[in-house]
Amino acid sequence: WQDIITIKTWPRPPAGLFFLRDFAIFLPDGTLAAAATSSWLFINRATRLPDRNAMKQVSLPYCHQSILGHDPKRLSENTGYEAMARVYPRFSDFDFHAHVNNSVYVGWIFDSYTSGFHEQHRPLRIQLDFIHELISDGEISIGMYRHGLIHHFEGRVSEKATLCFRALVEWH
């Protein structure tokens, strides 16, 4: 728990409406331990829609290096999801903008497994696609579709069946 790691991050030029940011995490010996790319967009607080004007006003020192070698692509829809968990967002799940933060979805997914599963498996790859903002504290249904050790997830507001996120976790 006392290891010192190095995290490097840099912005890449936007791809359409999305801004990209790459991350590289290195162990003390310089070995790459993890790599990630996030995509995000500016949202107008009043309309809750992408803000193209704000995008034009951003001036960042972009780096064209892609740590993954490709841009993130959306996960495709699957059928045959089985009910995995039901969760209720708590106050601490909401961010400054009063919606559930993407990192909370990963926690919900991981918490839906037994401790025995976690003792036998480690995540190899995680992908999370934000679909619709979650701003209520109602019940969220999490469904899972398994293909070997590749597990696909979707989270929906139970009351309206509104799709909030899709995710993929590959285990080893």
Positions of predicted regions on the chain:
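Hot-dog-fold acyl-thioester-processing enzymes
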Residues: 33-37, 44-124, 172
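HotDog/MaoC-like acyl-thioester-processing domains
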Residues: 1-74, 134-136, 145-172
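Aromatic side chains
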Residues: 23, 91-94, 105, 130, ...
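A conserved acidic, glycine/proline-rich C-terminal tail/linker
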Residues: 116, 120-147, 152
